[in-house]
Amino acid sequence: MPRQFFVGGNFKMNGTAESITAIIKNLNEAKLDETTEVVVSPPALYLTLAQQVADEKKKVAVSSQNVFDKPNGAFTGEISVSQLQDAKIPWTIIGHSERRVILKETDEFIARKVKAAIDGGISVIFCIGETLEEREADKTIEVVTKQLNAAAKELTKEQWSKVVIAYEPVWAIGTGKVATTQQAQEVHAAIRKWLADAISPEASENTRIIYGGSVSEKNCRELAQERDVDGFLVGGASLKPAFVDIINARL
């Protein structure tokens, strides 16, 4: 059975109630590829608003940009899995490079958050990727494997069915630089091989591996043709009308 194409829009720390409502209403009214799963991730303040607008047409799901690994307590500024459940938010992004680099989140901490989310019934867009220095040192596969291994220590084999892996080379995020189709496919194929060896052949066959890093309406169609590219995690372009073209990359 073919893997369902997946496109996520990470709004990051952008948007207002008005602009986020407009973006989702535009998606509600647009002609979208019905075979593509679409998820948008607004800032936490607007999650319930986004959910209400998305519920009007049920074409788009909503994701948090982050979640904490503890169930509740004195963790100022954090969001718990149970709070996402209560707000009926089905997805969360975990491990984005901006949190790894700026907020110093470790592989182990990120893995605990992935486990907490999945244990609580929240599906995860699990971000991994290397820096420019690591790529130039030919350590890309070593780095992403280390990030994956941390999660593998926390999850059961069955729980990988709730994970979408987002390969996002750090050097391509927000820079305008994009991994070539060959570079993206090489890493995606290595991740799929890791899934087969470390988790199970079923996980390798069924887990969606998406690409992120300056994805635009100009490069999405070529990337979407690659065998192991199952979709995209889109940053800045998800705030623009061109997001529809990226969702429809396989039409």
From Swiss-Prot:
The protein's UniProt keywords, in alphabetical order, are: Gluconeogenesis, Glycolysis, Isomerase
The answer to whether the entry has keyword Isomerase is yes
One short Pfam name that applies is TIM
The record's catalysed reaction(s) read: D-glyceraldehyde 3-phosphate = dihydroxyacetone phosphate
Q: What is its EC number?
A: 5.3.1.1
One CC-aspect GO term? cytosol
- Known pathway: Carbohydrate biosynthesis; gluconeogenesis; Carbohydrate degradation; glycolysis; D-glyceraldehyde 3-phosphate from glycerone phosphate: step 1/1
Per its UniProt record, what InterPro entries does this chain match?
Aldolase_TIM, TIM_sf, TrioseP_Isoase_bac/euk, Triosephosphate_isomerase, Triosephosphate_isomerase_AS
Q: Which residues bind substrate?
A: 10, 12
GO terms (molecular function) for this protein are: triose-phosphate isomerase activity
Q: What cystine pairs are annotated?
A: none
**A GO biological process held by the record:** glycerol catabolic process
Q: Which residues form the active site?
A: 96 (electrophile), 168 (proton acceptor)
- Quote the subunit structure annotation: Homodimer.
Matching PANTHER family: TRIOSEPHOSPHATE ISOMERASE
NCBIfam families xrefs: tim
Spell out the family assignment given in the record's similarity comment: Belongs to the triosephosphate isomerase family.
UniProt-recorded name of the protein: Triosephosphate isomerase
This protein's species is Aspergillus oryzae (strain ATCC 42149 / RIB 40) (Yellow koji mold)
Q: What is the lineage of its organism?
A: Eukaryota, Fungi, Dikarya, Ascomycota, Pezizomycotina
Q: Which gene encodes it?
A: tpiA
